[in-house]
Structures are given as C-alpha cells and as structure tokens.
C-alpha cells in the first residue's frame, strides 16, 4: 500500500492500492480494537502547539516535510495542534455544487479524500503524523483510534460523543432540537476527521469545534451531508477555551497511542 485517503467526516477509505485483509470491512468501527501503541522502544511522539493562526498552505508544506522525514527515519512522530484563519478545503471528491458561497473565504484544494469542510478560529485542528509501521498497519483501525481520542476527550468534559457507521466523525445527540424528517433524533457533528497515508505515515488528522463561528459552515454543505447540523463545545454550554481542550486531548491521545512529549521550543 502506497497511499490512502479518507475524508473529513464522510465516506469510506479510498485505498489506492490493494493491501487490506479480507476482514477489513467486516467489523464496525465500534468493535475495532483501538489500542495503537508503538513497538517497544519507540521514542515518544512530539507534541507541538502553535500559537496564533497558521496559514493553510504553510501548514501543508510543513506536514509534507515532516511526513517525508518520519518515513525516512530522520524524525520522530509528530502531533501538531493549531488553528487556521477562516477557509474552506476541498477534498478529491468535492462537488462544486456543495460550495454554496464560493467567495466567502479562500478555498484550498487538498490531497485528502472527501468533500468540503471549514476551518477557522475557535476550532482545534490536530494534524497527526504517525508511522503506522511502528504501530498497526490497519487504516480502519487507525480511523477508529482517532475517533476514540475525540470521544475520550469529550467524555472528560461529560459530553457524549458517538460514532456512526455511515458517516465518519464524532456526533452528539440533540434531543432539544426538532426531530429529523424520518422521525429520528437530531444530531450535530462536533468533530471531523480526514486522513491521508504515505508509505504508512499518516497526515492531516482531526478537528474539534471548541468555539468557532458556526455560521461559517453555512457556506458549504459539510462533507456533502445536509441532513445534520454542526455544533461546538461552547454551543453545548461548556465554558471552555482551546487550551483547556488541549490538555484533555493529550491525555486521551496517550491513552490510545502512547506517550507524547512537548516538542522543544514549541508553545504549550
């Protein structure tokens, strides 16, 4: 397997070359074991927190450099926490009809799978660059593990996040909202994820809505899914800041992926 992509919160993995076992799609993501600790003797993951807003193009260039270095054995794995200025990104399956307001913010084409998503201030973006050869070479288990990190983080704030087999990401039930047209309970997305793998090194990652301007999601059909809404921790009534979430994110990450240490010279 050379490269695979997964969208920010929708669809199945697009495997560009074969490499998955016959049981790949048999288990639900809830049933998959999500322990992704590295092989014994592996160094801890670098944990980087950037202050201020990081331009999207700059972040992608940095990810590309880090992924190449990790794949070559020249750098340790990295988790990078940051915020972007307001923007939309288009995955490889993006339908231009889902870009409702094309002039609202800059739109970036990106190599990840999937459709459109929004990034902006108040949203914690987490770029996860791990060498799955040191862990488990299982794309679906990796996606489930990232979702598990989000769910554990939310649980530490007494928020129940849930998976849905037909839509990747993490969702919260909204019983106070009107029922869906099919009679089901309303649900909002609170966290999205979208990954790409190169030589079994992951990049891109996940995002958690802490306190973004939720109106900016109206400029797109997020991941092509119009039946459900979008929420944030503050929208749910939690008086939290991004720094508070960062502490819990690291705790949850270490429970699933193993030790992480602040990068020398990094903020946080």
UniProtKB/Swiss-Prot annotation:
GO molecular function: lipoyl(octanoyl) transferase activity
Pathway of action: Protein modification; protein lipoylation via endogenous pathway; protein N(6)-(lipoyl)lysine from octanoyl-[acyl-carrier-protein]: step 1/2
Binding site for substrate: 112-119, 192-194, 205-207
BPL/LPL catalytic domain span: 73-261
Keyword terms, alphabetized: Acyltransferase, Cytoplasm, Transferase
One cellular-component annotation, GO: cytoplasm
Keyword Ribonucleoprotein set for record: no
Signal sequence region: none
Pfam families, per the entry: LplA-B_cat
An individual GO BP term: protein modification process
Positions bearing the site annotation: Lowers pKa of active site Cys: 189
This enzyme's EC code(s): 2.3.1.181
Compartments it resides in: Cytoplasm
Catalytic activity as recorded in UniProt: octanoyl-[ACP] + L-lysyl-[protein] = N(6)-octanoyl-L-lysyl-[protein] + holo-[ACP] + H(+)
Active site: 223
Gene3D superfamilies: Bira Bifunctional Protein, Domain 2
More about this protein: In the reaction, the free carboxyl group of octanoic acid is attached via an amide linkage to the epsilon-amino group of a specific lysine residue of lipoyl domains of lipoate-dependent enzymes.
Family assignment from sequence similarity: Belongs to the LipB family.
Functional description taken from the UniProt entry: Catalyzes the transfer of endogenously produced octanoic acid from octanoyl-acyl-carrier-protein onto the lipoyl domains of lipoate-dependent enzymes. Lipoyl-ACP can also act as a substrate although octanoyl-ACP is likely to be the physiological substrate.
HAMAP family on file: LipB
Protein name: Octanoyltransferase
Organism from which the protein derives: Agrobacterium fabrum (strain C58 / ATCC 33970) (Agrobacterium tumefaciens (strain C58))
